[in-house]
Amino acid sequence: MKLKALLLSLICCSAVYGQTVKYYLSMPKPQNHYFQVEMVLEGFEEKTIDVSLPVWAPGSYLVREFAKNINLVKATNGSGKALKVQKKKKNTWSITKGKSSEVRISYDVYAFELSVRTSFLDLTHGFVSGSGVFMFVENHLDTKGDVVVVPYAGFSKVSTALPRKEKNKPFVFTYSDYDHLVDCPIEIGNQLVFDFNASGVKHTVAIYGEGNFEIESLKRDMSRVIEEETKVFAQNPNKEYLFIIHNVVDGQGGLEHKNSTTLSVNRWTYSGSSYVKFLSLVAHEYFHLWNVKRIRPFELGPFDYNQENYTDLLWVMEGFTSYYDELLLLRAGYYTQSEFLSKMESSINYVEGSVGARVQPVAHASYDAWIKAYRPNENSSNTTMTYYTRGSIIASFLDVKIIRNTNGEKCLDHFLQHIYDKFYVKAGRGFTSQEFKSELESFTGENLDNFYADYIDGTAIPSYAELFDGMGVQVTDVTSTKPDFGASLRSSGGKAIVSRIRSNSAAEDAGLSVNDEIIGCNGYRVSKSDIEGLMKSLNEGEELELLIARDEILFSVSFTMTNYTRPRYLLNLTNEKNKLRAYWLR
């Protein structure tokens, strides 16, 4: 029986080992914005195979329904005989293959949304975000294979972090499993490509679009940022890394991958303060190659591509990264200590001055990213708080706490090194929220129940002076109470339109709603600037009669000015020499 079981096991392993999925990606007519995809499946024993297209892109927490871009799915066997294809659910197709050892599945993907998380194709270039283009075989995400890119005749280059299968075949790539495949975006066209070395890693930059960049400046400055990032973790796991940069009108940020990133920036961003912001984006996305792609909760890899993957730790994944994308620019010499504190001051005042900060805990903001952060509405500022900025402030608290507790011997860098080594290097896995908290408590030497209750699972306003005590930073509370309209306006065709209303404000009490047009005040026609100037001149208790148009119906509302208390803090360096500050803001 044991021999029989062993033989059976070997046969099964052989069958699984022989399974491959090969993709052919072509674009014969870029002006119609369609990629043509052919999947060649070999070695699958099932008589019926289900193939699916993901509903989301890892790193961007929103169900995007990529299957909406696919019109028709066809399948044949190795002899070219048509196979039955039945749509099973919104993003899944079932193929009856019978005993066929080879199955060819073909479909076209509409690609005309140029962002870091979606795909695009026109006569200037093509960009593939894998999760929106490549289907996978259900229950076989671990299957390996090849990708053959067939560029349009006018395109000469393909840039991707996927390894080339053979040196003499520049457009044939290989992948180890589906996660690997879709974690490597592909730029196709005539992009500018250059290389540089930093931290012992070859870095390639592929730039689409004109801009005011200078190649040598990018090499120098990106290298400085990368060197500082690598020092945080004391090692860089990559041998090669790719930056895909899209120079466009409306830059949209970046998206992280394990050994590459895509950055979307305004084409004129490469000078002055805008260039420093660009370097901050570089720092942010590059930091993710450790924090998110390797240091991660269980929910962030391997992925379930058919539905949301919930975690309450985005305040760590994105918040810690946001803290370091500024701190590392300080270490690299792009900020002074005062400039860094000014950045932190702005973050603190943004968070504490937001109504939503008193409503949504940062752990909840993480979990609800799928339905709130990526789907904002006119009321979002009253009910939500970004885990990016709030998380960066929490990271600063923890950094200072570790520095103070160790008298300047250790900092948050060392904690990140610890969990990177424990969970990624040695265990090769993610962690739970409780495991993260336990490791943090062990490293800081403190019970963090109250800290979590106040700042992670709660919405308390921190005592900033106490938290930064002993760090050579003076925190001044300049919270003020002033008359406040409680509404924001936008101008549309010369009309003053209400765009946002703060909850429990004078505007809300008066009955104003978003999208109302304010036409007049006390019998006089007013513009947006008139209203804003008038509101600034009012004292608490003063009244106005506003003429409103809502859904083309005119009516009046009585407005009474009320006060609003907005928390605000100033952060300044003290004049004293401070060992802990010197270590923190080095």
Regions found by a protein language model. Name each.
Residues 63-72, 76, 80-238, 250-251:
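Non-catalytic architectural context of zinc metalloproteases
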Residues 21-23, 35-39, 103-105, 145-147, ...:
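Hydrophobic residues positioned within well-ordered beta-strands of beta-sheet architectures
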Residues 1-22:
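Bacterial Sec-dependent N-terminal signal peptides
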Residues 316-332, 336-337:
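Extended catalytic-interface subdomain
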Residues 157-159, 238-240, 298, 330-342, ...:
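Acidic/polar loop patches that form or flank catalytic/metal-binding clefts of enzymes
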Residues 192-314, 320, 324:
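Juxtacatalytic substrate-recognition/specificity segment
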Residues 325, 335-586:
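C-terminal recognition in membrane/secretory proteostasis and scaffolding
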Residues 19-56:
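Early extracytoplasmic/domain-onset interaction patches
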